[in-house]
Each structure stands twice: as structure tokens, then as C-alpha cells.
Amino acid sequence: MAKEVSLSNTSAGGAALDILGLWKGFDGTEVLKGLSLNVPAGQFLSIVGRSGCGKSTLLRLIADLETIDGGTIQIDGNPLSEISGEVRMMFQDARLLPWRTVLQNIGIGLPNPWQNRARKALAEVGLSEHADKWPSQLSGGQRQRVALARALIHRPRLLLLDEPLGALDALTRLEMQDLIESIRARHGFTVLLVTHDVEEAIALGDRVIVMEQGEIVLELDIELARLRVRSSQAFTSIEEKVLSRVLNSRNAPSGDDCK
């Protein structure tokens, strides 16, 4: 369990995200088709759908890792070109540099002195004692905690999570879900989570959307108290509704899921 060490005294809360008429294609295939989406500041939005529906592409466009073919993305009313450092993204692969220590991985790109900030971020994810270890000495769950600390040190107002827990075992996954939820509650940043796990989406999200072939086909507010009882009738009712829509989705075009 992570210690209650927080960077929140320097956090700026969540950012509002507004997407209008977003289009993106790869090699002649339309991946996003005029998608529009509004996410209020501080909301946790879960995004689910079959492989190839455009979920990861959407996050990469918000992170400015891909160019937009059409439409607009604004954060707090400002275009992405005017945003600096307020958006951070986590992937399924922690992407740690093997030749740098855990602490050095967290401090990459920061001006000196960065060590104290890095240690606070590491403490917040419960890994203070691993600061001087190499990434190869960590478990998969620990590596993802380091990746989370690396995002937190930049005090993001919008955190994008692209299947960060997908490769973890069931117990570690639950622990990471609890950690993400507790840190998000303290900092108040906005979160977009892409996941294939509908239960995870409902457990963490304030709202869930289902994507199909580059479009939003279902949108539900999750009006359940936290911490959520996954075995409750209300929880399973939402889960069944989302699962039914995902399972009835049309087959997605090939080639997008690697985007």
C-alpha cells in the first residue's frame, strides 16, 4: 500500500477536454470519424471497445503524438499547440530506460535539482525503497508504479492511461487500480482510461463510453458511490449493459489496434 505522500500542494487540479469533429486515418482507413467528446475538469472517463475501434488512436491524438486530419482538440479552451506539460500518458509497457536507476527514470527531462521531487513521486506510489534499483530488478507492477510516478512528477492536469494494467496479474491489477483511484482523488486531475476490462472501467470511471469503428456508440454516467462494490446489483447491471454493447459491436477494420 502506498504511503500518503502527496505532491498535491503544487497540483493544479483537472483540465477540461473538448473534442469536436475529430478525424484520423491511416493508409486510407478511417480510424476516427468525426468524433466529438467533452470531458469536464476532474472527471475520470473510461473508454472501452473492441480492438481496432480507435481507442488508442484517440489518446495518442490528445497527447499530440499523432497529427490530426480534421477537427479540434482543446484543453481548457486552448489548442494543443498552446499546452505545455499538462498532459501525460502511460502505456501498457512502462518504457523505462534500463541503463538508468528507478529514481533517474522518474527525473528524466527535469532541471536540477530534481531528486527531492522524484523521491516524493516515488513515495506516493509506494516504492521509496527501490529508488536506486535498476528497472530489471522490478516486477511488472512495480515498473508500472514507476511509470505512474514519472507522470506525477510533472503535475499533470490530464492523465491518459492506455491499457497500463493490461499485462499485470489479477491481484497486482487490483492493487494498481486502488493506487490510481487514491492518487487521482488526492490530486483531482482529469483521467482518460482505455481498457478492454469492462469491470475495471466501471470500478474506476465516473463515466464510460463504448467506441465502435471510430465513433462513440454508448455513453453512461456511473452514479455509484466509491469505493465500489463490484458484486452489487447496481454495478453488475451497468457492467452487463456495457458488455452487451461491446459484444454486439460490428467487426472493426484491421490495422488500427497497433496505432
Curated annotation (Swiss-Prot):
It catalyses: ATP + H2O + aliphatic sulfonate-[sulfonate-binding protein]Side 1 = ADP + phosphate + aliphatic sulfonateSide 2 + [sulfonate-binding protein]Side 1. The complex is composed of two ATP-binding proteins (SsuB), two transmembrane proteins (SsuC) and a solute-binding protein (SsuA). Belongs to the ABC transporter superfamily. Aliphatic sulfonates importer (TC 3.A.1.17.2) family. Pfam families: ABC_tran. It is an enzyme of class 7 (translocase). The gene is ssuB2. One of its GO terms (cellular component) is plasma membrane. InterPro entries: AAA+_ATPase (IPR003593), ABC_transporter-like_ATP-bd (IPR003439), ABC_transporter-like_CS (IPR017871), ABC_transporter_ATP-bind (IPR050166), P-loop_NTPase (IPR027417). It is a peripheral membrane protein. Its main location: membrane. Part of the ABC transporter complex SsuABC involved in aliphatic sulfonates import. Responsible for energy coupling to the transport system. This is Aliphatic sulfonates import ATP-binding protein SsuB 2. PROSITE patterns: ABC_TRANSPORTER_1, ABC_TRANSPORTER_2, SSUB. Keywords: ATP-binding, Cell inner membrane, Cell membrane, Membrane, Nucleotide-binding, Plasmid, Translocase, Transport. The keyword Lipid biosynthesis does not apply. It is found in: Cell inner membrane. ATP binds at G49, R50, S51, G52, C53, G54, K55, S56. Residues 17-238 form the ABC transporter domain. Its EC number is 7.6.2.14. GO terms for molecular function: ATP binding; ATP hydrolysis activity. The keyword Oxidoreductase does not apply.
